[in-house]
Amino acid sequence: MSHYTGIILKLESDRAIVLTDGLDFMELKLKPGMQRGQHVIFDESDLYSAGLITRYKSIIMPFSAFAAAAAVFLVILFSLRFVSISQEYAYIDVDINPSIGLVIDKKEKVIDAKPLNNDAKPILDEAAPKDMPLYDALSKILDISKKNGYINSADNIVLFSASINSGRNNVSESDKGIQEIISTLKDVAKDAGVKFEIIPSTEEDRQKALDQNLSMGRYAIYVKAVEEGVNLNLEDARNLSVSEILGKVNIGKFAISDTPEDSGIMPAISVPAEPVPSVTPAYTAVPEKTEAQPVDIPKSSPTPASFTAHVPTPPKTPSIPHTSGPAIVHTPAADKTTPTFTGSSTPVPTNVVAIASTPVPVSTPKPVSTPAYSSTPTPESTPVPVSTPKPASTPTPASTPKPVSTPTHVSTPKPISTPTSTPRPASTPKPTSTPTPESTPKPTSTPAPVSTPTSTPIPTYTSTPASTPIPAYTSTPTSIPTLTPATSPAPTSSPTPIPSPAPTETDLLTKIELQAYNHIRTSETKELQPRIKLINTGNTPITLSEVKIRYYYTKDQVINEIYTCDWSNITSSKITGTVVQMSNPKPNADSYVEIGFTNSAGVLNPGEYVEIISRIGNSYALSLATPPYSEWNYMYDQNSDYSFNNSSSDFVVWDKITVYISGTLYWGIEP
């Protein structure tokens, strides 16, 4: 890829005119930091548009080359401008969230196009609408906007504004021309399947809009907001989305909308009016039985008032018998007088239906699910109490269990040893172990244990009562029982699972989703351009100043990196960004940019989203300034970047970009 160097001669709203070292004039995309007289280095990707490059090779002496080239440029520029102005018939501004200005001739062919904000530049570069018919140019712009995610839901509204060049047309021609343009705009929007608003404008308002760096449509809404006392300043008018500013100001009186002009909307509007109840029964009756009297229908249909006026005049007595079938309650009232006819709406049986729904609380017996507490018999731990008999010794009243041992009918002499098992009756299923004492008849010296009932826990110590036949040693382990109680409390630690419910906090109501794609998807690039959309999918508002988003990449040979936010739906001034070098690099990530929000960013409510368009790169690259020799050659290899998405040109769910709230990871997978 070839590189050029040159000097910036002039800055315009969206481009910079540069004189190269080879004495060629080129137009570059305007970027932050550009200044007149500045030396810059650039390549073909930085050109404003390949079709707009104007080259003039110098054939004069080097010492006068600059002046001569500038003179040629000015002469041709003014000549072209004169020709262009003579053809300018009308001006069309399109606000999607990118804003684009088009100039057309009388045949509705686009003769000029320019971006009104930074987001519009790539769209215009791809669409190249110049010399296209207006319909084709707008269709292509809308298609590209959909592909790039600017039109991605039914909530998006496209705002068109148009004005006629008053210097070329008289009033009647202007009126006719604006109507033809509006018709074209409607056709384009409807064929593209988008919602739209069209605001006709004047040449005077267009000039005022240009002075404020606004499209005609946004300026008209701003003026309306000022008139109505709505809180909408110029900054908001520039940066808020079309849907947001339309939500603040009612433009219905001076804009043309795609809202269908159906009369079907009127009944909904007239429902609150008192005559309406009389209208609704009449509508239900008329379609069914008045087919034989079509003459009366048009008389009554114009307005509810005229309809009720006609009710008494054509005594509907012949039709009443017919209507009495389907609606006996309403027609008798209509028979007598129109006042009672309005009252006939009162018997709306829907109230009865509402009452019928009240029995639904019968479903409240769901509390019967409380038996779920039957899970409380978690004595599943009771099988574990094979060791729990030891605690049985803890209630040292070994003598007291003896009376309990009497029920153990197996061998009354042995019950002395059984007292140790007497605690087992607490877990009645355990008595199955009692048959083992039957093998103990061998110790005929059972009377000796009478003196040492406390030592009887020894069988529990062995944990296998089969060894109990050796009670001869029962005298020595007298000290052992004292140890066993010490271990017995250990099982009480089993309740430790209680902490598990701790995680169930209101935090779990906070849920987010991140979608992303990369605007530049080539492997090698001078700057990274991730586009990110953060959506609150939970039930609680999220304080944006507590949110951090991390995009991971390898810096390769690039140095002096900076982050810049080109655009956000909450304004770029509320977005922050820091480039961080990782202390523990990974194979595909040794750095990340951490994107955050200022305190003024406010909160992200459930269902809302924040969209961010960013760039990361060398500080000279982002401003197109000439870098020092040490930074001359630099490129990112995006294929080695962890967060790079080369598979999509639109927003998709992406978990290789992480999101943290108050330092806790809420979304994504770290590298």
From Swiss-Prot:
It is a single-pass membrane protein. Its main location: membrane. The keyword Metal-binding applies. Residues 79-671 are extracellular. One of its GO terms (cellular component) is plasma membrane. InterPro entries: Anti-sigma_RsgI_N (IPR024449), CBM2/CBM3_carb-bd_dom_sf (IPR008965), CBM3 (IPR001956), CBM3_sf (IPR036966), RsgI_M (IPR055431). The keyword Oxidoreductase does not apply. PROSITE patterns: CBM3, RSGI_N. GO terms for biological process: carbohydrate metabolic process. Residues 359-379, 401-425, 447-491 have a biased composition (Low complexity). Residues 4-51 form the RsgI N-terminal anti-sigma domain. Residues 508-671 form the CBM3 domain. Pfam families: CBM_3, RsgI_M, RsgI_N. Anti-sigma factor for SigI2. Negatively regulates SigI2 activity through direct interaction. Binding of the polysaccharide substrate to the extracellular C-terminal sensing domain of RsgI2 may induce a conformational change in its N-terminal cytoplasmic region, leading to the release and activation of SigI2. This is Anti-sigma-I factor RsgI2.
